[in-house]
């Protein structure tokens, strides 16, 4: 269930999800990638940001809910592959 104060973004490549602090709530892999594709969610605003807070492997479709991981410096999705991903955040 998505509450009213949540935001949603879908992507297939590296994406800045939020430019300042936020909380990653859920990840939905809506179209699988191939092989060892993955999405690394980084605490920052670009692909060189550290640390990696969370990694989701996208070789299969799936729903990952109730993550509630807090990012202090932004949420950046560093994508490896061509899976389609939808993220719920606040």
Which stretches of residues belong to each language-model region?
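Exposed aromatic-hydrophobic patches
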Residues: 61-69
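Noncatalytic modules at the cell exterior or secretory-pathway interfaces
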Residues: 25-27, 68-81
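Solvent-exposed serine/threonine-rich low-complexity stretches and specific carbohydrate-binding patches
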Residues: 51-59
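C-terminal interaction-tip segments
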Residues: 1-21, 32, 78-90
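Short, surface-exposed beta-strand/strand-loop-strand elements in extracellular ectodomains
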Residues: 34-51, 86-88
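Beta-strand-rich, repetitive solenoid scaffolds
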Residues: 43-44, 56-57, 78-79, 88
């Amino acid at each position: 269930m998505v509450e009213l104060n949540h935001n949603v973004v879908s992507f297939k490549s590296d994406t800045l999800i939020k430019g300042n602090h936020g909380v990653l709530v859920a990840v939905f892999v809506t179209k699988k990638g191939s092989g060892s594709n993955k999405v690394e969610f980084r605490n920052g605003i670009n692909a060189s940001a550290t640390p990696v807070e969370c990694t989701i492997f996208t070789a299969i479709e799936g729903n990952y809910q109730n993550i509630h991981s807090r990012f202090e410096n932004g949420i950046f999705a560093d994508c490896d592959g061509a899976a389609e991903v939808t993220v719920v955040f606040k």
